């Protein structure tokens, strides 16, 4: 007569911590496995998944790394993107590397990067 999974789980649920520890040791010996190795193997992918989830950003910063040769076009692009005045945009371009836009969506960051690169700037999205 085989026990069902539910019956096994009920039996385990009724055990004390000491009894569970002894059961695990006996299972390790009988089947030639280590519960610690299984725990590490299970934890490693979970940690990797957590890192992948942490890498999924929702806010991005567009950073002007270099103005490039065509500084006037870059200043115009910065003014269009930010709404800054001529002097403020020129100061931002001259002070590169500097953030142009912060806390924006990925699509907006990519569009801003494209616009600045078309003007001749070197841009990073962080």
Curated annotation (Swiss-Prot):
Q: Which GO terms describe its molecular function?
A: mRNA binding; structural constituent of ribosome
The reply to whether Membrane figures as a keyword in the UniProt entry is no
InterPro entries referenced in this protein's UniProt entry, alphabetically:
Ribosomal_bL12, Ribosomal_bL12_C, Ribosomal_bL12_C/ClpS-like, Ribosomal_bL12_oligo, Ribosomal_bL12_oligo_N_sf
Presence of the UniProt keyword Ribonucleoprotein in the record: yes
Q: Which UniProt keywords apply?
A: Ribonucleoprotein, Ribosomal protein
Read off the Pfam families from this record: Ribosomal_L12, Ribosomal_L12_N
BP-aspect Gene Ontology terms: translation
Cellular component annotations (GO), alphabetically ordered: cytosolic large ribosomal subunit
| Cross-referenced NCBIfam families | L12
Record-stated family = Belongs to the bacterial ribosomal protein bL12 family.
What the protein does comes down to:
Forms part of the ribosomal stalk which helps the ribosome interact with GTP-bound translation factors. Is thus essential for accurate translation.
Q: Give the record's subunit note.
A: Homodimer. Part of the ribosomal stalk of the 50S ribosomal subunit. Forms a multimeric L10(L12)X complex, where L10 forms an elongated spine to which 2 to 4 L12 dimers bind in a sequential fashion. Binds GTP-bound translation factors.
Quote the protein name from its UniProt record: Large ribosomal subunit protein bL12
Q: Which organism is it from?
A: Bordetella petrii (strain ATCC BAA-461 / DSM 12804 / CCUG 43448)
Phylogenetic classification of the source organism:
Bacteria, Pseudomonadati, Pseudomonadota, Betaproteobacteria, Burkholderiales
What's the encoding gene here? rplL
């Amino acid at each position: 007569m085989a026990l069902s999974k539910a019956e096994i789980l009920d039996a385990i649920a009724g055990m004390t911590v000491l009894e569970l520890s002894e059961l695990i040791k006996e299972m390790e010996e009988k089947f030639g496995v280590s519960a610690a190795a299984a725990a590490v193997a299970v934890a490693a992918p979970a940690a990797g998944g957590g890192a992948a989830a942490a890498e999924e950003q929702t806010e991005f910063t567009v950073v002007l790394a270099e103005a490039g040769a065509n500084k006037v076009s870059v200043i115009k692009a910065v003014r269009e993107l930010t709404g800054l005045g001529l002097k403020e945009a020129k100061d931002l371009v001259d002070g590169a590397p500097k953030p142009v836009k912060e806390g924006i969506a990925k699509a907006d960051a990519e569009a801003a990067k494209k616009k600045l690169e078309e003007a001749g700037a070197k841009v990073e999205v962080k």
